[in-house]
């Protein structure tokens, strides 16, 4: 990567709070497999309020109930974790597997989160804030539109165009959506 190339950051999860007293943290993972967030030994914690990003090394991680619990090197107290509450866990897009030149409906989740979702007639539905695996197909969780939250199946019949460069997903809603 050249020095002039801008890094595209991908949010893999969020620090949700402390777990216990010894620096463990509850993490909301946005990866397809919740423990997939542990595939990345280095996390960049982005504070959206301060617009700062801090590189941290993953200490340990494990599944716990429906979520995940992690430790970071150098973060050893509950108070230190509390200071990280709400930060986004990010990695450079270049550190994720390549979805190919035309990912179609096989694009990886990280590429879809943050995309604007628009109906084929131009009606804005919101942005993809999360993905969900259902077994039959993946589901886009879309928020921020006039109709509130929408759950859209990530299938060819619904996703008619995917423009990752412009971060736009065009959809054709099925009856009842």
Curated annotation (Swiss-Prot):
UniProt record, GO biological process: ribosomal small subunit biogenesis; rRNA processing
Protein name: Ribosome maturation factor RimM
Subcellular location: Cytoplasm
Superkingdom of the organism of origin: Bacteria
Taxonomic path: Bacteria, Pseudomonadati, Pseudomonadota, Alphaproteobacteria, Magnetococcales
Gene3D superfamilies the UniProt entry points to: PRC-barrel domain, RimM
GO molecular function annotations of the record: ribosome binding
Gene behind this protein: rimM
Record's comment describing the protein's domains: The PRC barrel domain binds ribosomal protein uS19.
InterPro entries: PRC_barrel-like_sf, PRC_RimM, RimM, RimM_N, RimM_N_sf, Transl_B-barrel_sf
Gene Ontology CC entries for this record: cytoplasm; ribosome
Record note on quaternary structure: Binds ribosomal protein uS19.
Entry keywords, A to Z: Chaperone, Cytoplasm, Ribosome biogenesis, rRNA processing
Domain PRC barrel: 104-177
Chief location of this protein within or outside the cell: cytoplasm
Pfam families the record matches: PRC_RimM, RimM
């Amino acid at each position: 990567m050249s020095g002039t190339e801008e890094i595209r950051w991908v949010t893999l999860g969020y620090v949700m709070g402390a777990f216990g007293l010894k620096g463990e943290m509850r993490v909301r993972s946005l990866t397809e497999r919740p423990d997939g967030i542990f595939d990345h030994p280095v996390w960049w914690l982005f504070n959206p309020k301060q617009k700062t990003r801090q590189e941290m090394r993953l200490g340990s991680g494990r599944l716990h109930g429906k979520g995940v619990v992690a430790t970071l090197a150098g973060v050893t107290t509950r108070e230190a974790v509390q200071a990280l509450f709400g930060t986004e866990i990010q990695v450079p897009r270049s550190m994720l597997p390549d979805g190919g030149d035309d990912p179609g409906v096989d694009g990886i989740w990280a590429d879809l989160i943050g995309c604007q979702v628009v109906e084929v007639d131009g009606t804005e539905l919101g942005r993809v804030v999360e993905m969900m695996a259902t077994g039959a197909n993946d589901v886009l969780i879309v928020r921020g539109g006039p109709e509130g939250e929408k759950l859209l199946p990530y299938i060819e019949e619904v996703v008619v165009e995917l423009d990752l460069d412009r971060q736009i997903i065009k959809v054709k809603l099925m009856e009842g959506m």
